[in-house]
């Protein structure tokens, strides 16, 4: 079989409107969302099938992509398509309430679960890296991480600055698909931000889509923009063209200490995701092929320089946090023994939300009409009338977030709200208030769907950080509940060997059957997050389980 990764002639865009090209809306949704992942306005490098996160792909090759589309277009309502690391490998009879697509991406037996072995298989065309929402077809552009980042920066503001971020600034690295959300989220939370990015095209993309306010090509100009804005009490963001390790070190040498320091480069993948100091992008890309080992070593040494600077900033009083790209581990691998002295963002700022099943709930309007999203925004406000913080988020999102590809929205809600909101959306489709069905999903970064000891499950209070039964149970339960597609991935966010995680997507098509499926799946899915945290002993999760009536047989066992 031929194997084409790069095809510069490709330009993918998901169909809009109400005309079906498949047997029903469940299958149509899978087709459109796969295509949407590769839209030029959504993906980082769509002609190479790369959606975000280093080499996170939507399909293994263009031949596989074409065959997936062809298979979805002939799939019957009682069949399920199986995807193995981006390749369509089988269609089997199931039933109409079963998932239409079942996906497994990047999974390796633990002894072989490392980048070296994965890269061998990847070169042979036997695997692909699915990241989290790239290979599970529910990426929505940088908006997908904006609210989570906004929630984190809001928590940083409350914990360290009495809730007032005015006159404070954040230093970070990386403006890719995930990192690109940081500048907008920071300014929404009241901070100024300096974001270092080595690829100028990424800064330009974030400028064009409104995620970053200014571009600078040297540190002095960037700092002047930041300082002038803070003096006026304004919150702005600056994308600085440069190498993160260089800039962090230069700030340290100048004696400049930011108020908050983090990083969202693709440090999880040292071969493809982190530019070594002193290298050009062209040199980096060439050496990925000619000297993979040397490239990885050089990238990790540069990460160590950056992490040492972050540790220095922490000693100088900055609030320093790992934002989930595993840069601490990479630095520790090459001798920074105290790399973990600064915390990850989940245990420091997000875990109480996870204890209530609260996480990144997202939905997409298959009509392609932004008005459908604005109507659902208002429905969420109507159904959750007393959450001013959520209302503020939805208002800011409408005003400040540009849609990428099919119109979409994200908001962090939990066990008590997801199912009832999804069923309300289904009623809106049924009544014709929405022009077409709505796709509902989430990030794999959620309360019950991931095991990642250096990120989502870092520092669990019972020591169960590395137990990965939980995402497997989550995927099994969502399959049994009737989700439209379910995925099981390895290595997302933090790289090979460091995480296992599950995704779920379900369609609200206005039918009675969909109403029942939505009620099951979107109760069960966040319910597994409350279950996982209650099992680990968190009182917030135990109380939530009791209040919401979860049936957890060991809940009150001493």
UniProtKB/Swiss-Prot annotation:
Annotated GO MF terms: urocanate hydratase activity
Positions bound to NAD(+): 53-54, 131, 177-179, 197, 202, 243-244, 264-268, 274-275, 323, 493
Pfam families named in the record: Urocanase, Urocanase_C, Urocanase_N
Gene3D superfamilies with a match to the protein in the record: Urocanase like domains, Urocanase superfamily
Pathway: Amino-acid degradation; L-histidine degradation into L-glutamate; N-formimidoyl-L-glutamate from L-histidine: step 2/3
Enzyme Commission number(s) from the entry: 4.2.1.49
Cofactor: NAD(+)
Principal cellular location given in the protein's record: cytoplasm
Enzyme class (EC, first level): lyase
Catalytic activity of the protein: 4-imidazolone-5-propanoate = trans-urocanate + H2O
Origin: domain of life: Bacteria
Active site: 411
Subcellular location: Cytoplasm
UniProt remark on cofactor binding: Binds 1 NAD(+) per subunit.
HAMAP family: HutU (MF_00577)
Name by which UniProt lists this protein: Urocanate hydratase
Source organism of the structure: Idiomarina loihiensis (strain ATCC BAA-735 / DSM 15497 / L2-TR)
Gene name linked to the record: hutU
């Amino acid at each position: 079989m031929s194997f084409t990764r790069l095809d510069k002639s490709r330009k993918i865009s998901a169909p809009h409107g109400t005309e079906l090209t498949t047997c029903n809306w469940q299958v149509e949704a899978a087709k459109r969302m796969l295509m949407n992942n590769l839209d030029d306005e959504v993906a980082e490098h769509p002609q190479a099938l790369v959606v975000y996160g280093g080499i996170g792909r939507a399909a293994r090759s263009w031949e596989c992509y074409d065959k997936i589309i062809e298979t979805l277009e002939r799939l019957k309502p009682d069949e399920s398509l199986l995807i193995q690391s981006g390749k369509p490998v089988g269609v089997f009879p199931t039933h109409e309430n079963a998932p239409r697509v079942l996906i497994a991406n990047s999974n390796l037996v633990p002894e072989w679960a490392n980048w070296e072995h994965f890269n061998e298989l990847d070169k042979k065309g036997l695997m692909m890296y699915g990241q989290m929402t790239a290979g599970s077809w529910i990426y929505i552009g940088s908006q997908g991480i904006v609210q989570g980042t906004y929630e984190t920066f809001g928590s940083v503001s409350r914990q360290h600055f009495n809730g007032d971020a005015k006159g404070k600034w954040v230093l970070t690295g990386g403006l890719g698909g995930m990192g690109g959300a940081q500048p907008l989220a920071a300014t929404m939370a009241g901070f100024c931000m300096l974001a270092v990015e080595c690829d100028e095209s990424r800064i330009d993309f974030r400028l064009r889509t409104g995620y970053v306010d200014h571009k600078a090509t040297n540190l002095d100009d960037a700092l002047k923009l930041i300082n002038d804005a803070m003096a006026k009490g304004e919150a702005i963001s600056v994308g600085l063209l440069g190498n993160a390790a260089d800039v962090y070190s230069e700030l340290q040498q100048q004696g400049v200490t930011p108020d908050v320091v983090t990083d969202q480069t693709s440090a999880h993948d040292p071969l493809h995701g982190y530019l070594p100091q002193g290298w050009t992008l062209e040199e980096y890309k060439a050496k990925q092929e000619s000297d993979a080992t040397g490239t990885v070593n050089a990238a990790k040494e540069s990460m160590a320089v950056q992490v040492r600077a972050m540790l220095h900033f922490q000693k100088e009083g900055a609030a320093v946090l790992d934002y989930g790209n595993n840069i601490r581990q990479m630095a520790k691998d090459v001798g920074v023994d105290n790399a973990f002295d600064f915390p990850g963002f989940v245990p420091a700022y997000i875990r109480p939300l996870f204890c209530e099943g609260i996480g990144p709930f997202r939905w997409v309007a298959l009509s392609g009409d932004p008005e459908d999203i604005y109507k659902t925004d208002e429905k969420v406000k109507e159904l959750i009338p007393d959450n001013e913080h959520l209302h503020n988020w939805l208002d800011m999102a409408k005003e400040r977030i540009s849609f990428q590809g099919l119109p979409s929205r994200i908001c962090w809600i939990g066990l008590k709200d997801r199912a009832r909101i999804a069923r309300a959306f289904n009623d809106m489709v049924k009544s014709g208030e929405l022009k077409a069905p709505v796709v509902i999903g989430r990030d794999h970064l959620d309360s019950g769907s991931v095991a990642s000891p250096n990120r989502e499950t870092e520092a669990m209070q019972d020591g169960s950080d590395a137990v990965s039964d939980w995402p497997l149970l989550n995927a099994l339960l969502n399959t049994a509940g009737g989700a439209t597609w379910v995925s099981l991935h390895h290595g997302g966010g933090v790289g090979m060997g460091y995480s296992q995680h599950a995704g779920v997507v379900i369609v609200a098509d206005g039918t009675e059957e969909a109403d029942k499926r939505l009620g099951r799946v979107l109760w069960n899915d966040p319910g597994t997050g409350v279950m996982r945290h209650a099992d680990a002993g968190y009182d917030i999760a135990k109380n939530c389980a009791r209040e919401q009536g979860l049936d957890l047989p060991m809940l009150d066992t001493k």
